């Protein structure tokens, strides 16, 4: 059976995620995903893949894990997920703990979508060279897998 989900930028002016999640669950949606951008650099040369001007939502994006915790607290069965989390911009030890915690408090409903990102300047502000993003992505996924599956990682 086909399942339907929603995706939305969680911002300070969007529908609050607890209200959106509760409504989505009542209407029969399977999932709710939110994207991630830590910030948009004031001086950005990277073109937005969408073509035109970068939508203002990018400048106002809330933290996905805190936002999804709010969504999980307002629902019982709605799957919650990142679409996507920029793990090239995150510490893998801290992220592994945040992801495991959110999955636990949501009752196993978290879907973790990950990616490397497109915004070169944003990435470089986190100390990651754009040319190494795929290597860093792989390393951090493997590190998190070790943390989640080994007694000592």
Q: Where are the predicted features?
A:
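N-terminal beta1-alpha1-beta2 module of alpha/beta enzyme domains
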Residues: 1-74
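Flexible, glycine-rich active-site loops centered on histidine and acidic residues
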Residues: 2-15, 45, 86-153
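Structural motif corresponding to the early beta-alpha repeats
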Residues: 65-73, 79-88
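Glycine-rich, flexible loop/turn motifs
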Residues: 44, 55-61, 74, 80, ...
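Acidic (Asp/Glu)-rich catalytic clusters
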Residues: 25-26, 68-77, 99, 103-110
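Hydrophobic residues within beta-strands of alpha/beta enzymes
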Residues: 32, 80, 110-112
């Amino acid at each position: 059976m086909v399942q339907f989900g929603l995706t939305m930028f969680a911002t300070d002016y969007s529908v609050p995620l607890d209200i959106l999640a509760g409504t989505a669950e009542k209407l029969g949606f399977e999932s709710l995903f939110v994207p991630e951008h830590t910030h948009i650099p004031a001086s950005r040369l990277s073109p937005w893949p969408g073509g035109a001007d970068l939508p203002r939502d990018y400048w106002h994006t809330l933290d996905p894990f805190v936002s999804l915790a709010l969504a999980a607290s307002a629902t019982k069965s709605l799957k919650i997920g990142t679409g996507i989390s920029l793990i090239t911009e995150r510490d893998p030890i801290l992220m592994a703990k945040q992801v495991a915690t959110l999955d636990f408090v949501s009752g196993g409903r978290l879907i973790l979508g990950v990616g490397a990102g497109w915004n070169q300047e944003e990435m470089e502000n986190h100390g990651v060279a754009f040319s190494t993003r795929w290597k860093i992505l792989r390393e951090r996924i493997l590190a998190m897998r070790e943390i989640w599956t080994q007694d000592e990682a």
